[in-house]
Amino acid sequence: MAKVPPGLDRYRLIMDLSFVTQRMPAGMALNEIRIGSRSDPEIRDAVMPMMSAISEDYVRLVSRIACEAGLKPTRELHGLTGTVAMATRALAINTFTYPSPRVGENVAWTLQTMREDLIARQLGPNKARHPPPLAEKD
């Protein structure tokens, strides 16, 4: 991230890196805590302040990077940030037991398209870099 100057490329990169960070040991550990807290009220009560702070810090980071790129921190941008985080979290967890590259490609393409649609709406179509259509495979 530090090698990419502020702007749309950095914003695109942080969104694309979400899946990578979810698959890192620290990301997987956080996911395991999230999953464990669903059925254990004591764990949930113990980790909720920390997990909430991590989530809020992430939203602030992405919002700052988005603002540096000229984007407005609207509800749509926050919704996209949450969607990317939740989708890549689920993808990181699920691909350990269902390692289908096609699922990952489909999800990544959809998230990138949503991101570029937001960029086009806020900054104009000339700023968007939509991914090429996915090749249909049998």
What residue ranges belong to the model's regions?
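Residues in soluble alpha-helical coiled-coils and helical-bundle/repeat scaffolds
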Residues: 2-5, 38, 42
